[in-house]
Curated annotation (Swiss-Prot):
Protein name, entry field: 62 kDa protein
Induction of synthesis: Repressed by acid stress.
Native source organism of the sequence: Bacillus cereus
Amino acid sequence: MTKDEPLEGNVGVLT
């Protein structure tokens, strides 16, 4: 799970 892969569920982390 990286910044380039918000698909995992880290979408809230980037936004």
